[in-house]
Amino acid sequence: VRSRCMDKDVPVNVILPQEYSDTMQYPVVYLLHGYSDKYTSWSREGVVGRLADMYNFVVVMPDGGYDSWYFDSPVVKEYRYETFVSQELVSYVDSCYSTIKDRKGRAITGLSMGGHGAFYIAMKHQDTFSCMGSLSGGLDIRPFTKKWNIAGRLGAYEQYPERWEENTVINMTHLLTPGSMNIVFECGTGDFFYKVNCNMHDKLLKEGIPHDYYVRPGGHSWTYWLRNIKYQFMYFSDCFNKKTK
């Protein structure tokens, strides 16, 4: 997909349900990969393809770069993945496929860096998405200032603490109002992001924001993500079928 804002072509993997027909309009799940992965990463073992068939979803998996964290980076101007995913990609998908061209038919989720990205993009673009999810997401990046080149996207924490404070998902809950988004997230108890996910859950509870939060045994691994992505799709299916938000 050509990104005008980044002036480059971005690889995107699109899975259509087996019964796809131009006479129907389908909900779309935008599925984001993690740090060091790429647009093909979620395709492993055919799990997502089977879920697309089961729920009749179009699934869109963009390349988020090795370490973009899905920000519009103030440091590296050619990293504008928030704008790409929320605007250019959605526009492209709606023009090329028979989709529900409304927030009620769009969800966004991802794993790890992509879980952060999904929450980050959805919270800032609630007019575009009605559902947001995360598996093992980095929902608070502040404890990890030296990790995964986040500093390469935001600048060093020591120099630009305000950028880290403004762009960590856990500090963005003021953008939500009760019922404004359908929210589902989960994390394994053995995951290094477990504590920040629990903190996010506690903060949403305190602020009266309805959400589903699941904790299961497991670590930061493809075994965990491939086993549990089905619960996100189940949740999105329920939301799309209600069509209330």
What are these regions (language model features)?
Residues V1-K245:
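Non-catalytic cap/lid and distal C-terminal segments of serine-dependent acyl enzymes
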